[in-house]
Amino acid sequence: VKLVIDCRYVRTDHHDGISRYTAGLVGALAELHPLTMLISDERQLRLLPDLPRHRVSSPTGAGEPFVARQVNALDPDVVFSPMQTMGSWGRRYKLVLTVHDLIYYRHGTPPRDLPAPVRALWRAYHLAWWPQRLLLDRADAVVTVSRTTAAAITEHRLTRRPVTVVPNAADPLPDGPAEPARRLVYMGSFMPYKNVDALVRAAALLPDHELHLMSRVPDGERARLTALAPSARLVFHDGASDEEYAAALRGATALVTASRDEGFGIPLVEAMSLGTPVVVSDIPVFREVAADAGAYVDPDDAAGFAAAVRALDDPAERAARGEASRARAATYTWANSAATLLDLLTTL
């Protein structure tokens, strides 16, 4: 089977979630089966393995609906895309598309960094289910990253095609000495559904803990969060390398998130892989990902988050959570996910 993997959503500077998913799967899949990568920018190769590649047009260009005409030149049997928007008109190959989450149907605010016209289209697209159905039913099969999202796809009848769960995994973070510190770590965006406000309020109830916010944050959002709970000890990293992120996690009391919705939850796996406990909102996908390793709190219960963090002051509880975390994280590997994906791609 001649496989082509759409790598055009890989970033040129540093990974985001979909970029990391693509690179992780491609690297592991190449260990199992020959493949060719589709790229749209040579700079993407910085974050991809050294494999055969073919350059085509950008996935955000006006010609995307017709990109299959370029892909046909490779004479592939199957093409896998880590998104659901890959153009398919005129294709002469099997196509597998991916849905990562359905967050924006329930939380309609688009990413703030999109241009205004794209934001308008984003809102319009997520006002109804039928555009998603049209996209997915063009494929021969659909992939998603969690059982929770697969269930939602079924609930809303988003496709007539078979749906396969190919989970995310976490790239190994740099290991090193871990000196225990009263430090809470949040890795994620500051979009409203992420509910960072609840973490800030919880931090105000934990005066002996710092809350480290690792991601880039707009100046206005930083000021708003600081004013929300002036007594909270907030540390804004405004972006962090893998090394800085790992250093923050090692020895931290917990990774925390009060998100109301996710497709998976990669930061949970990253933290658990280092033996760092996770204190997270009680939503189905976090129960799926962390299982018995997690501590779960109502997303609006700041006092509940504070109590769950204080429970980790008990050395025995902290040790048990750390051991359970490492064991749970070990179940998520790119090798396992690639094997699942390869089975799908070679049996269409």
Identify the residue ranges that each predicted region occupies.
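Carbohydrate transferase catalytic cores enriched for Leloir-type hexosyltransferases
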Residues: 1-348
